[in-house]
Structures are given as structure tokens and as C-alpha cells.
A protein has these predicted regions:
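Domain-terminus/edge residues, biased toward the C-terminal soluble/receptor-binding domains
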Residues: 4, 8, 13-253
Length: 253
């Protein structure tokens, strides 16, 4: 499950139906999955696709419609790597775009916008995040005392091998970092340990800043911490979440 909560799809063509709806967050969650499939990203960047003529049909050429991916277009955006356009008279213009500036990968969703505004709105949103937020790898910072080592997405991929889904290489989503405003320090981030597997000694660390989720990391925990869990010195609920001081690890990162 991707975690969407406000969508219901009743057709595959996207045409209007009162029972066919979604929201920006759910579309962003769907768009985030594209990062898992490099082959799909490659397809999205094609400038056109041609279906050759046959005995029964003429040649059909399908051009790229996402203007941020067309170098000759005034709306071209150098960091855009994939996306999908949409329009109905009821929904107006919609646009989902994926961008990568070499440091941060983002998904932007713009809904119910008039066509002339959809590309500049998307670019402005991307530029705001790229210019005002920072991506901090947690492995480069001081580890929480409970953590033995962090497990990166590349580690998971090497251990599991390259899974194949529908003929496309599948890659785990990158984690192990936090996204913070540039004027905020990593030491101001709080964390909570969840989903601990006592057999493997692995689990997830959820990071928050000012009550907002800012990232997560997969980690292998110390024997001392695992012993605390098994002996009940740390209160852990059925989901494997450490509950301290009101349900949250009180220590700063």
C-alpha cells in the first residue's frame, strides 16, 4: 500500500465521473513510486514514440506533451525527469512532475489550475524547495545511542538482489536522510524508533521536526537496546514502537 487515503478510481481513462477522484498528496505518493523504476523514467523522457504503419492502420506518432521535458519549449525545466499532464473541463489542468537537481528528488502535484499557470506554478514550487531546504544524510551525523549502524537503500538492494517486476528493474526507495529548512540544525530533530524486529535487530527510525515528519531511516540496533526491549525495560507496543516519555524517544538526534 502506498498510503493514499483520499482517492477512488473507477476508470482507466481519467474522464470525469463523480466517483473518480484523488488529491494532491495521493498523486504525489503514486508519483514517488516512479523513482523505483529507472526504465519508466527513461520512457517518460522520450520526446516522441512512433507506432509503425501496418496492413490495417497508418503510422501514429505520439509527441511528448509535458512541456518541462521539451528542451525547445519555453517551459523547459532542467531538473524535470518525468511527469504526466491531464485535463478535463471539470478538473481543469492537472500536472504531476518529478525533478532531480542532483541532491534532492522531488514530486510536485498541481491540481485544478488554468493551463497558462500550470508550468510556472510547478517550477516555482520546485525552486522554493531546492533553494530553502537541505537534505541531510543521517549516517553523516551523530548516531542515536540505540543505533549500531544505518542500512541504506543500496545495501537492501544488494542483499535482496534486483527484483524484476513486469520486466522492469525494481529499486527500493531511498531513505536515510532528513529534509530540513536551511536555517535548522540536525541537532534540533527528534526521533522515534518503530517496527523493531528482534530476530534481525533491524527497525525504522522516524524523524520529526516541530511535529512534522522530515524523514526516516532503516537501522540495525545495538545489542544493549535489543536486550532492553526483550526484558521489558523499554516499553514496546505490538507494532514494535518504542514508547518513552509520551510515546516518543525524548533524546535529540
Amino acid at each position: 500500500s502506498l498510503g493514499g487515503e483520499n482517492s477512488n478510481f473507477v476508470n482507466a481513462n481519467g474522464l470525469h465521473d463523480d466517483n473518480h477522484y484523488t488529491c494532491a498528496r495521493d498523486m504525489a505518493l503514486i508519483g514517488r513510486e516512479i523513482w523505483r523504476y529507472p526504465e519508466f523514467l527513461k520512457i517518460c523522457q522520450e520526446q516522441s514514440y512512433t507506432i509503425p504503419a501496418s496492413d490495417t492502420t497508418e503510422e501514429h506518432v505520439f509527441p511528448q506533451h509535458h512541456k518541462m521535458l521539451i528542451k525547445e519549449n519555453k517551459n523547459y525545466y532542467q531538473y524535470a525527469v518525468a511527469g504526466k499532464t491531464g485535463y478535463t473541463s471539470n478538473a481543469l489542468s492537472t500536472l504531476i512532475t518529478m525533478a532531480d537537481n542532483g541532491n534532492m528528488k522531488l514530486v510536485c502535484v498541481v491540481l485544478r489550475t488554468h493551463g497558462a499557470n500550470i508550468y510556472p506554478d510547478t517550477k516555482n514550487l520546485f525552486e522554493y524547495v531546492f533553494n530553502n531546504f537541505q537534505k541531510i544524510p543521517v549516517a553523516d551525523e551523530k548516531k542515536p545511542t540505540e543505533v549500531k549502524e544505518f542500512i541504506t537503500a543500496s545495501d537492501e538492494s544488494e542483499n535482496a538482489g534486483s527484483a524484476q517486476t513486469g520486466g522492469n528493474e525494481y529499486q527500493p526507495l531511498e531513505d536515510g536522510y532528513v529534509i530540513l529548512p536551511k536555517d535548522v540544525s540536525y541537532k534540533d530533530v527528534d526521533y522515534e524508533i518503530t517496527d523493531v524486529d528482534e530476530k534481525t535487530g533491524e527497525g525504522t527510525i522516524q524523524y520529526t521536526y516541530d511535529g512534522h515528519s522530515v524523514g526516516s531511516a532503516t537501522a540495525k540496533f545495538t545489542e544493549k537496546y535489543l536486550q532492553k526491549i526483550s526484558t521489558g525495560k523499554e516499553c514496546v507496543d505490538n507494532s514494535g514502537t518504542t514508547k518513552n516519555s509520551g510515546g516518543k524517544s525524548s533524546a535529540k538526534s
